[in-house]
Amino acid sequence: MAGITAALVKELRDKTGVGMMDCKKALGETDGDFEAAVDWLRKKGLSKAAKKADRVAAEGLVAVATQGGQGAVVEVNSETDFVARNEKFQTAVKEIAALAIGGSGDVAEIKAASTSGGSTVEDHLTNLIATIGENMALRRAAVVVAEPGVVASYVHNPAATDMGAIGVLVGLQSDGDKDKLAELGRKIAMHVAAGSPAVAVSVDVDGVDSAIADKEREVFADQARQAGKPDSIVEKMVEGRMRKFYEEVVLLKQAFVMDPDNTIEQVLEAAAKDLGAPVTISGFVRMALGEGVEKGPEEDFAAEVAAASGQS
């Protein structure tokens, strides 16, 4: 083992695509003989993971995990929905979501985290690729914090507990009763999952990207001018349409899907009276499987997934 350097382990990993721990073991089993180590990995069926990593991972699962005032949601892709139903894959995804709690949501950070088996998340996924026979990748992750308070979750059409095609986290910041907050948070998470009347882009008006708001304002103004309206009327029309726009995309302004007569903001105000403490939304995340990936030619999609998950 004395002749086995970190550089040699890295070289073997680069050639085979196998995790660092397995590469180190292969070199140890072959007394540091590089080519023999490659053959050893091939015989173990591990080096095939490198070729599989080039294949498209379009399916998979979105998983959520919460712990008091912290929560995380991750998307792990696989090639087929058949693998998404595989117990080993689901167990791995569940652990990855749990490991993401308390972090920043950075994919590279999560990949470097240690699993219960002692390997890193990245190496564990590489081993699963070889074991299950399909490419898979941790594509993205996000976290929500509400302290004091709770982070509630909801998974739409779950494939297993806390994982499915759409995962939502909602942080409710308050000193109120945690059980009541959790119940309210889950209902709001269900609202966010529904995306009605549109998928919310921010908690409040100030959180809407100024570029998006400016573009909408410009479009509304052009429409009014093309209708021959004078400038004094144009401005009033634009303001009215912007209010409608915010009612569609700002969470607090949206009509609550379970009680359309009240907005989310009004629901929170009522909850605050019931709890005897203010209730605010610290943040929310809605993650849908495959969202934001352009499904063009297969090689382009594979590149997008690889880029999003930090793979080279």
UniProtKB/Swiss-Prot annotation:
Region (Involved in Mg(2+) ion dislocation from EF-Tu) location: 80-83
PROSITE patterns in UniProt: EF_TS_1, EF_TS_2
Keywords: Cytoplasm, Elongation factor, Protein biosynthesis
Localization terms from the record: Cytoplasm
Gene3D superfamilies documented for this protein: 1.10.286.20, DNA helicase RuvA subunit, C-terminal domain, Elongation factor Ts, dimerisation domain
Gene Ontology molecular function: translation elongation factor activity
Family under the similarity heading: Belongs to the EF-Ts family.
Protein name from the UniProt record: Elongation factor Ts
Originating organism: Maricaulis maris (strain MCS10)
